[in-house]
UniProtKB/Swiss-Prot annotation:
Organism: Mycobacteroides abscessus (strain ATCC 19977 / DSM 44196 / CCUG 20993 / CIP 104536 / JCM 13569 / NCTC 13031 / TMC 1543 / L948) (Mycobacterium abscessus)
Enzyme nomenclature, EC number: 5.4.3.8
Catalytic activity: (S)-4-amino-5-oxopentanoate = 5-aminolevulinate
Protein name: Glutamate-1-semialdehyde 2,1-aminomutase
Oligomeric form and interacting partners: Homodimer.
Family per record: Belongs to the class-III pyridoxal-phosphate-dependent aminotransferase family. HemL subfamily.
Cofactor requirements of the protein: pyridoxal 5'-phosphate
One biological process term in Gene Ontology: protoporphyrinogen IX biosynthetic process
GO molecular function, one term: glutamate-1-semialdehyde 2,1-aminomutase activity
Cross-referenced CDD domains: OAT_like
UniProt-listed PANTHER family: GLUTAMATE-1-SEMIALDEHYDE 2,1-AMINOMUTASE (PTHR43713), GLUTAMATE-1-SEMIALDEHYDE 2,1-AMINOMUTASE 1, CHLOROPLASTIC-RELATED (PTHR43713:SF3)
Amino acid sequence: MDDLASAETLDAVSDETPNSARLFADASTVIPGGVNSPVRAFAAVGGVPRFVRSGAGCWLTDVDDNRYVDLVCSWGPLILGHAHPAVVEAVQRAAKDGLSYGAPVEGEIELAREIIDRVQPVEKVRLVNSGTEATMSAVRLARGFTGRPKIVKFAGCYHGHADALLADAGSGLATFGLPSSPGVTGASAADTIVLPYNDIGAVAQVFAEQGDHIAAVITEAAAGNMGTVAPGPDFNAGLRRITENHGALLIMDEVMTGFRVSRSGWYGIDQVAGDLVTFGKVMSGGMPAAAFGGRADIMDRLAPLGPVYQAGTLSGNPVAVAAGLASLRAADAKAYETLDRNADALIALLTASLDAEGVAHHIGRAGNMFSVFFGTEPVRDFQSAKATETWRYPAFFHGLLSRGVYPPASAFETWFVSTALDDEAFDRIADALPAAARAAAAAEEN
């Protein structure tokens, strides 16, 4: 049994989760760390991850029959909540006809058109299977289109686990305190330039020095993997100006923000168009699917039209396409109003409870995405995010989880709401928060 599933950790599990403890111990004998994505291991907060039996609306039920208000939403995709009838029906209908063909299906065209209709600068779309594939492919395409080798990214922004993009990344790397990953060679990272987020001056300087060698800047349209950190008022627009002036491309990573913060994603908020845009999460309807798209002249460099190769056996999978299309079509204007209203209400409850206990904090927010930063200083980049009082978060997390509220298991992850949050859910949250806030106030730095 490895460190993540140590006897000490298992002993910390309450009597209410024996089945999760048993399954986690069992999983750790056949799956590294007992999980298939690191943040699920609860390593940053302690305890044993809850093994989920089912989800319905805004509620999760674990294998011990405990119910939780879900404020993770599968890390973002489930804006409509779990098992939304329209999505389930679409998946069942598609699955009845066949699970995979390795051939084109009509639904691919419909999903691509839905994305293009929502994000007007996107003229063509290629479907893939994950956000990592989308960003990895967009970077390769940018290099192939420009003939240049270097990519600029920002510290704390996570663009999937492709080697070239793991330098100083957020998400799990931030959670585990890793600057990069063993196995990423110097050659893989040599053409990646990492700059501070929200520092347009640093971008201007590096382009002045190396602009002829830079293929693209890739940025999260609004950062959600160092906690939630919105771009400064002129940051994205500044990136647009600088890349245009130097003949480089701007890759907007909307895997997290796309179709969540508005019908058109972050583009619908700041109107800054990427030459290439990556999508995932919401457009998948909860299935393994993602996409990247952009200007037609760039996208047409992809095989089979052009020389930049990208392929995938399961890309455009008919069941995943059906789920994504149903999810997007159900996400109408009313849905986005509900998401914003639910985020407002939840943030108000969080703020009131923490204020009542005198816990210094800031809410980082980008549309209806947000996170809680403990401490007195505002957060605008990865350095300031790492300087917060993250040691308060485990106590706060377990104060909520033990009372039936499921927040993200890391201080560096974003909280997500769904349209399915109801009065019962908000009552549960309101009841749980005072004790969780007291736990955060009483926490001591190790």
